[in-house]
Amino acid sequence: MIIFEKQTDVKTYLKPFLQDQKTIGFVPTMGALHQGHLSLMKESLQNNDHTVVSIFVNPTQFNNPEDLKKYPRTLESDVEKIKLLNHKIIIYAPTVEDIYEGKTASKSFDYDGLELQMEGKHRPGHFDGVGTIVKKLFEIVNPTHAYFGEKDFQQLAIVRKLVQKNKINTKIVGCKILREANQLAMSSRNERLTADERTKAAMIYNTLAEAKKLFGTKSANEVTKWVTKTFENQSMFELEYFEITDEQTLLTCKRKNKNKKYRAFIAVFVNNIKLIDNISLK
């Protein structure tokens, strides 16, 4: 199994593959790997000659220093999981110094307003951090395809916009959300929940599923009010936002249009641990 820590080494290693026009699939992660991440890797393995996985907790996308401090760092077990899946996967696990070269700061990006909604509204600067690291990693790896999960649907839309605006020659592949047995969306943050919280967090997806049913006959505003009311009586959960948006622009749905696709997004705090999820409303 090959593990690189320096960008110069990974670039040198991948260069002959690029010269031979081999396809390179790329799965960028922040570690604390779960089955959702592994499903992205499987997708890449099936569709590319080589697969690269990066493991890097990116400081510039955390607007809360406490969240960055508490984010799980489990490099050894992450490497074991990847090895069990396929020992030919190339791992790039850089240091902050290697990536940012002494300047740990974000660049500013314009994503045509995608960054102003939901996560962008509640986490100022977050998507500048995401854009900065994704662009840097793409420049290092030069992937043919890059794989992102739909759980972070807004991030997926933003990465697509980043690639389009910067004319990056990488195809972005969105992969379906993997869920636990109780339908809670798989997330590295789930590891910080107690067993009881993890069980009861099934309510998040159940609420989305019910909202989808209601959206068939009710307006977006009525569904949003119902979701807000549902969470008012829940002491364990604090609703940060629930939004029904146009799937393309991520703008809030004011009035339904049968020619558009809509998606519902939710963010909930469980004992200061933020969980997000979304569902297609078609």
UniProtKB/Swiss-Prot annotation:
Pathway(s) where this gene product acts: Cofactor biosynthesis; (R)-pantothenate biosynthesis; (R)-pantothenate from (R)-pantoate and beta-alanine: step 1/1
Residues forming the catalytic site: H37 (proton donor)
ATP-binding recorded as keyword: yes
Residues where beta-alanine binds: Q61
GO terms of molecular function: ATP binding; pantoate-beta-alanine ligase activity
Entry keyword set: ATP-binding, Cytoplasm, Ligase, Nucleotide-binding, Pantothenate biosynthesis
GO CC list: cytosol
Substrates-to-products reaction catalysed: (R)-pantoate + beta-alanine + ATP = (R)-pantothenate + AMP + diphosphate + H(+)
Amino acids binding ATP: 30-37, 149-152, 178, 186-189
Pfam families, per the entry: Pantoate_ligase
EC numbers on record: 6.3.2.1
Cellular compartment(s): Cytoplasm
Disulfide bonds: none
Binding site for (R)-pantoate: Q61, Q155
GO biological process, one term: pantothenate biosynthetic process
Complex and partners: Homodimer.
Other remarks in the entry: The reaction proceeds by a bi uni uni bi ping pong mechanism.
Biological role stated in the UniProt entry: Catalyzes the condensation of pantoate with beta-alanine in an ATP-dependent reaction via a pantoyl-adenylate intermediate.
Family note: Belongs to the pantothenate synthetase family.
UniProt xrefs under HAMAP family: PanC
Name this polypeptide is given: Pantothenate synthetase
Organism: Flavobacterium psychrophilum (strain ATCC 49511 / DSM 21280 / CIP 103535 / JIP02/86)
Gene that specifies this protein: panC
